[in-house]
Structure formats: structure tokens, C-alpha cells
Amino acid sequence: MAPKKDEKPATRAATQEAGVEATAKAEAKPKAEKAAKKAKKEPAKKAAKEPKGDGEKKDKKKKSAVETYKLYIYKVLKQVHPDTGISSKAMSIMNSFINDIFEKVATEASKLSRYNKKPTVTSREIQTAVRLVLPGELAKHAVSEGTKAVTKFTSG
């Protein structure tokens, strides 16, 4: 097919003129419209920047959460001996001690539930595990305190 003669030829000059006209139209827009558009864009940018700024701070502060018993050890110490302090090294040792005992009791309770072919570790398995892991009088006190705690939890 032959090109129609009525069509304007697409030349480099024609496309440049179209680009100049588009730029002139953009410049001809009132300043109020541009200011309004900027005002609309700026809050979005600020909102986007603020969480990012906070995010950077959070990234710096964010560490893996290590759960310890230090606060609870300190509270019990103050209940028993209000005028006594504890060094950080002693606190670390106490925390390790509690973690070790917890692991031993949990392992023993898990074994007991497997022996009984039960999928759930109940308070009964925990109680038996405490009796097996802790010696004599300490086991009796631990069982009575545990029973008291479970009763308090279930009733209230």
C-alpha cells in the first residue's frame, strides 16, 4: 500500500517542535497548581521518611530478644533479703542455674509423657519430673509451690 499524501511526514523537526510545545504547556501551568501538587507530594514523602528514620533507629537497637530470669531473681531476692544486692556475675550464674533446671525438668517431663504414650505434657508429668530431678526437701517445697501456682492460675 502506498502512503497517503494527506498525512504529514514524521520528521525530526516535527517531533522536536511537539516536545517544545509540551514543555511550554507545562511551564504555562499556574504556580498555584504546582505548589498544590508539591504540597500533596511532600507529606507523603515525609510520612515515608519518618518510618524509615525510625526504622533505622530500630535496626540499630534491634537485637535478638534474649529472655532471662534476672528480673524475677532480683524480685525474689528483695522479698527474702531486702537489704542484700547481687553482682552481675552472680546474677548470670543464677540465670544459668534456672535455665539448666528448667531444661532438666522439661526433658524428664517429656520422657514421662512418651513412656505413657501421651502427646501432651500435663501438670502431673511436670510434678513427677520435679520429684525426680530435685532432691528431697527441695522437691517437696517445689511441688507445693507449683500446686499453689496452678491452683491460683486456674481459679483466677
UniProtKB/Swiss-Prot annotation:
Superkingdom of source: Eukaryota
Keywords: Acetylation, Chromosome, DNA-binding, Isopeptide bond, Nucleosome core, Nucleus, Ubl conjugation
PTM characteristics: The N-terminus is blocked. Can be acetylated to form H2BK33ac and H2BK34ac. Acetylated mainly on the ubiquitinated form.
Region (Disordered): 1-63
Record GO terms (molecular function): DNA binding; protein heterodimerization activity; structural constituent of chromatin
Main location: nucleus
Cross-link Glycyl lysine isopeptide (Lys-Gly) (interchain with G-Cter in ubiquitin), sequence positions: K152
GO cellular component, one term: nucleosome
CDD domains the UniProt entry points to: HFD_H2B
Basic and acidic residues bias spans: 1-10, 24-58
Pfam families in UniProt: Histone
Entry-annotated residues carrying N6-acetyllysine: K40, K41
UniProt-annotated location(s): Nucleus; Chromosome
Subunit structure: The nucleosome is a histone octamer containing two molecules each of H2A, H2B, H3 and H4 assembled in one H3-H4 heterotetramer and two H2A-H2B heterodimers. The octamer wraps approximately 147 bp of DNA.
Entry's family note: Belongs to the histone H2B family.
Biological role stated in the UniProt entry: Core component of nucleosome. Nucleosomes wrap and compact DNA into chromatin, limiting DNA accessibility to the cellular machineries which require DNA as a template. Histones thereby play a central role in transcription regulation, DNA repair, DNA replication and chromosomal stability. DNA accessibility is regulated via a complex set of post-translational modifications of histones, also called histone code, and nucleosome remodeling.
Name recorded for this polypeptide: Histone H2B.2
